[in-house]
């Protein structure tokens, strides 16, 4: 039989699409300098392998029984997933090295009564066992494997018939059908497609663990994130022991949901009331401190906003921000100068969201601008007040979403007063008892109530 020749294609490292010739700019994603040469062995065409799968009427599907989710045994994980793992779903779990991806994946496995398969191409079975012992993970249904060939993994799935498969990690798995190294764009794309077929055809849940690049995105083609049903990120840093599990994409639930965990020696521990965690060490005797109820998905979390304003002694004033958008802070400082006459041109400004949280909710504007003004004037704010509102360029305080949810969280933690946009307050049918709600139309009115 004559030897089959290889075909040359050019694969984009950004989007994963291939092209018959080289371009300086990828025609699919418009990224520059991302196409690389790749050899693909030509395969003989096969005849028709069978009839296509029959289609189904939507009405028949809706009349059938609702697909039941599988609880993971961890309430915070179930919250982010939308109620548990859905059979047939492909889930991508990403995060920095050492953040807790493998730990979380191992901790959910004892909740399954049917067989589960944990594949770690980075560790041996004995090493996985040591980790499981430290986490107190013990289950007769848990099967461990260090296989790194996708073909071998599929054979093990056929043998074990698991309810859940965990792949740790997608960057270390490869296919014999390709000549490229594990972790390359082509290998990740091929293995991802085979795992997607595995999940859909066998109706089992598959969790893929992925590493992040230095830019903070999952290593490999962007197509991988489009391919999967759910994309989860674990966020955190070495300076704090809490971890945030966030859903960036969820076809079967709400995106941007978060679960809060605390990293301890025996694994990730759920935090039932994250607001208390982030406010536990707040000081009441300093200026520049405000409280803002952030919405993370459907969950309200009270966050302390700290600001420090001091004279600039080294020429150009500094603007340092932690957890808040730098450009948005610059806009708020301009509003302070133009609309309220508080000069910031010769002041260093530092803004910090306590606990390492990162917030992009515009409703935090009023809390941030008030914290800066409090520090600039060195005046204390009432300790039991909550600030909510988006600030416009004219200094107006604009309405925000789901004010009632934010207020209920503040009331539950003992706060007595809320300053919110007048437009939101007027739309409230009933005001909750035990907490005073003051409506403001601009930042000046809020300052008049506070200072």
Language-model features: locations:
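P-loop (Walker A) phosphate-binding loop of NTP-binding proteins
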Residues: 96, 121
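Conserved RecA-like ASCE P-loop NTPase motor core of nucleic-acid helicases/translocases
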Residues: 116-120
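Conserved Rossmann-like nucleotide-cofactor binding loop
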Residues: 124
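Peripheral, non-AAA+ core regions of ATP-driven protein-machinery
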Residues: 4-14, 18-81, 86-92, 99-115, ...
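Conserved SAM-binding strand-loop segment of SAM-dependent methyltransferases
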Residues: 143-145
